[in-house]
């Protein structure tokens, strides 16, 4: 059963400029394993994290560090969640998080669907 959906779009060049202007931005938004990726990949991961927050209903108190985009053995993206994000997901009955990301023509997009068992 679908529990939530979220989508986000990020302008890659604008994100890159923000990251250059604000040295603490990348460490605040991304887990250590994500930080060395190129701007287009970071922008897509930021869009993914924004989309996940929307899919979870936009709760406050979430740490960006509690959401990490990882790749499985086939290269497919997924989330590793912890802390408040994991607690909110569990409280909302979320048992699966589906993620799709793309970047093209200067834009990064992400779409998230959260699922859970029927009540």
Swiss-Prot record:
Q: Name one Pfam family in it.
A: ACPS
- E.C. numbers: 2.7.8.7
Q: Which domain of life is it from?
A: Bacteria
Q: Which reaction does it catalyse?
A: apo-[ACP] + CoA = holo-[ACP] + adenosine 3',5'-bisphosphate + H(+)
Q: Where does Mg(2+) bind?
A: 8, 50
Q: Does the keyword Cell cycle apply?
A: no
Q: List UniProt keywords, sorted A-Z.
A: Cytoplasm, Fatty acid biosynthesis, Fatty acid metabolism, Lipid biosynthesis, Lipid metabolism, Magnesium, Metal-binding, Transferase
- Gene3D superfamilies documented for this protein: 4'-phosphopantetheinyl transferase domain
* Coiled-coil parts of chain: none
Cofactor(s) this protein cannot do without: Mg(2+)
Q: Which GO terms describe its cellular component?
A: cytoplasm
Where in the cell does this protein reside? Cytoplasm
Q: Name one GO molecular function term.
A: holo-[acyl-carrier-protein] synthase activity
Q: Which HAMAP family match?
A: AcpS (MF_00101)
Give the record's family classification. Belongs to the P-Pant transferase superfamily. AcpS family.
What name appears for this protein in its UniProt entry?
A: Holo-[acyl-carrier-protein] synthase
Q: Which organism is it from?
A: Clavibacter michiganensis subsp. michiganensis (strain NCPPB 382)
């Amino acid at each position: 059963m679908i529990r939530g959906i979220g989508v986000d779009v990020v302008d890659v060049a604008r994100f890159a400029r923000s990251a250059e202007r604000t040295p603490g931005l990348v460490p605040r938004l991304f887990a250590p394993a994500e930080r060395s990726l190129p701007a287009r990949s970071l922008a897509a991961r930021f869009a993914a994290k924004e989309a996940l927050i929307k899919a979870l209903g936009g709760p406050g108190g979430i740490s960006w560090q509690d959401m990490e985009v990882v790749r499985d053995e086939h290269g497919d993206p997924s989330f590793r969640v912890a802390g408040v994000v994991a607690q909110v997901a569990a409280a909302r009955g979320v048992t699966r998080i589906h993620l799709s990301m793309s970047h093209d023509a200067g834009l990064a997009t992400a779409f998230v669907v959260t699922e859970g068992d029927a009540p």
